[in-house]
Amino acid sequence: MMRNVYSVGQVNAYIKNMFTQDFMLNRIYVKGEVSNCKYHTSGHIYFSLKDESGMIACIMFAGQRGGLSFRMQEGQQVIVLGNVTTYERDGKYQLLSLIHISEPTRRSYI
């Protein structure tokens, strides 16, 4: 019996490709509470969005920060427009934030 055996890298690359091709996971709006927010010296912002049922890791690259008119902080309720993708090296998925529009109310859009 012949078995297909794949490397970790092959599996992660395949999963990344599946995420990229899934139209539901591209340009998706996700709402949640900002958690674990860290501004990196590179200009990127690393954070998580959470709600009562789960959490997703997020990244906003420095080049995407132009439209962000407020400083993200722990506990803010936000809506993020982005693409769900994978970080192949670690085999983890994350939300890659694309655009940011803020509102003056407690609910902000990023």
Task: Describe the residue ranges of each PLM region.
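OB-fold and OB-like beta-barrel modules that bind single-stranded nucleic acids
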Residues: I28-V34, G75-T86
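OB-fold (S1/OB) nucleic-acid-binding surfaces
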Residues: I45-C58
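Short, Lys/Arg- and Gly-enriched loop/turn segments at beta-strand edges
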Residues: H44-I45, T86-L95
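Conserved positions in beta-strands of structured domains
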Residues: S35-K38, K50, F61, T85
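Short nucleic-acid-contacting surface segments enriched for D/E, G, S/T with interspersed K/R
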Residues: R65-I79
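Short boundary/loop segments of OB/S1/cold-shock single-stranded nucleic-acid-binding domains
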Residues: S7-N26
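A beta-strand/beta-hairpin structural motif
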Residues: C58-Q64
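Single conserved hydrophobic/aromatic residue that forms the stacking wall/gate
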Residues: I99-I110
